[in-house]
């Protein structure tokens, strides 16, 4: 239907990956670490779906640029790629996540705990999301950068 280099195909893959990944991981963090109720977390996750739809493709483009810059300056090493993936994820997602929690009425302490936990968990999560995104792009047959 769309060519592997199609922007729509790429945007669809990026959107699918971000919505699925953030829903599952975000709910786990909010309930298990931040002390949010199931209802608060579900509200946050449901609000995050349209937000993630809006930011998924811009994040994918941002991530690709960060990875390309890291590759250009640090080579194509696993560690360089992992640190770049982590930086891209944390620098783009943390402000968005804090805003979502604020909108659903989480307390300042809950927001601080959730965002801080997310930063710590992002040591693995941001890199893991990068691999999940690449997997989804392959599923959608997107030409990888």
Swiss-Prot record:
GO terms for cellular component: plasma membrane. One of its GO terms (molecular function) is L-amino acid efflux transmembrane transporter activity. Keywords: Amino-acid transport, Cell inner membrane, Cell membrane, Membrane, Transmembrane, Transmembrane helix, Transport. It is a multi-pass membrane protein. The keyword Calcium does not apply. This is L-alanine exporter AlaE. Belongs to the AlaE exporter family. GO terms for biological process: amino acid export across plasma membrane. Coiled coil: none annotated. Exports L-alanine. It comes from the Bacteria. The keyword Iron does not apply. It holds the Pfam family AlaE.
């Amino acid at each position: 239907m769309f060519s592997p280099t199609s922007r729509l195909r790429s945007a669809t893959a990026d959107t699918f990956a971000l919505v699925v990944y953030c829903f599952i991981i975000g709910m786990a963090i909010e309930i298990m670490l931040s002390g949010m109720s199931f209802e608060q977390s579900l509200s946050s996750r449901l609000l995050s779906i349209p937000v993630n739809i809006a930011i998924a493709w811009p994040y994918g483009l941002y991530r690709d640029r960060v990875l390309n810059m890291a590759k250009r300056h640090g080579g194509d090493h696993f560690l360089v790629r992992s640190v770049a993936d982590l930086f891209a994820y944390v620098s783009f997602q943390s402000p968005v996540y804090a805003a979502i929690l604020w909108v659903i009425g989480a307390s300042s302490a809950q927001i601080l705990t959730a965002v801080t936990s997310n930063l710590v968990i992002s040591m693995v999560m941001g890199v893991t999301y990068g691999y999940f995104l690449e997997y989804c792009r392959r599923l959608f047959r997107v030409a990888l950068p």
